[in-house]
């Protein structure tokens, strides 16, 4: 085996990525704080929308508030999720704009034309928004109504009265909604990582089982802590990962 064989995980690019994240830390923290600032005032309207949404509250379920701080904590949670969303959007935009130049400063061929960068950024933005909308539709029409209806019927089947705490219910719903929007960004994130050389296609294909497990684990982290939610969030991530690999193969 010769020494020029490319590493499955390019360590030089990975180290440069870590350096890039450190340099962007101030910007990312700023975007998170901006998300908190924007998210908290509008979180009241978001809560009202969820309360009125079809299928989010089964007919035989009663909502209660146990502690006076529940609404404030809910608004902070929603604002935090918006802040995290802005941080991820910033990373995607920066990575798509700078490309390999961001990761490998020795690359001289990534300067490109300004118009090319604009086109690439526009494509990434439209793709990200489109994937987010698809994720939101999946959560709104399939994931949330199906799960809540299942949980309500399961409790009724054993003779229990469905009385849900506002914070627990809405935290569950917003967690699923946020997880769906983020998880549907998987194809875009994988393609950006492949095209910038941070990871190689060999790494993804050779470690497919581990990545599938990681996707399900990430689904458990992003979604409420129950097995059904984990598979309903992590499952689409696995499918979207395979779609992104197919797109990468076709577009090369």
Q: Where in this protein do the model-derived segments appear?
A:
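Membrane topogenic/interface segments and analogous intrinsically disordered interaction regions
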Residues: 1-252
């Amino acid at each position: 085996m010769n020494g020029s064989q490319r590493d499955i995980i390019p360590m030089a690019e990975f180290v440069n990525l870590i350096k890039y994240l450190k340099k962007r830390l101030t910007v990312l923290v700023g975007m998170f704080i901006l998300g908190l600032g924007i998210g908290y005032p509008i979180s009241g309207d978001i809560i009202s929308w969820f309360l009125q949404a079809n299928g989010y509250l089964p007919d035989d379920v009663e909502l209660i508030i146990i502690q006076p701080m529940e609404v404030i904590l809910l608004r902070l949670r929603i604002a935090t999720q918006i802040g995290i969303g802005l941080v991820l959007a910033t990373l995607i935009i920066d990575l798509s704009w700078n490309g390999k130049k961001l990761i490998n400063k020795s690359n001289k061929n990534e300067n490109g034309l300004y118009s090319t960068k604009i086109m690439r950024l526009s494509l990434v933005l439209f793709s990200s928004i489109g994937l987010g909308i698809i994720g939101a539709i999946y959560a709104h029409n399939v994931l949330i109504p199906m799960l809540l209806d299942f949980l309500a019927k399961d409790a009724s089947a054993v003779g229990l009265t469905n009385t849900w705490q506002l914070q627990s219910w809405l935290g569950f719903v917003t967690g699923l909604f946020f997880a769906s929007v983020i998880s549907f960004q998987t194809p875009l994130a994988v393609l950006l990582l492949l095209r910038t050389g941070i990871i190689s296609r060999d790494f993804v294909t050779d470690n497919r089982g581990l990545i599938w497990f990681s996707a399900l684990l990430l689904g458990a982290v992003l979604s409420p802590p129950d097995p059904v939610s984990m598979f309903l969030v992590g499952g689409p991530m696995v499918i979207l990962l395979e779609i992104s690999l197919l797109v990468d193969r076709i577009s090369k």
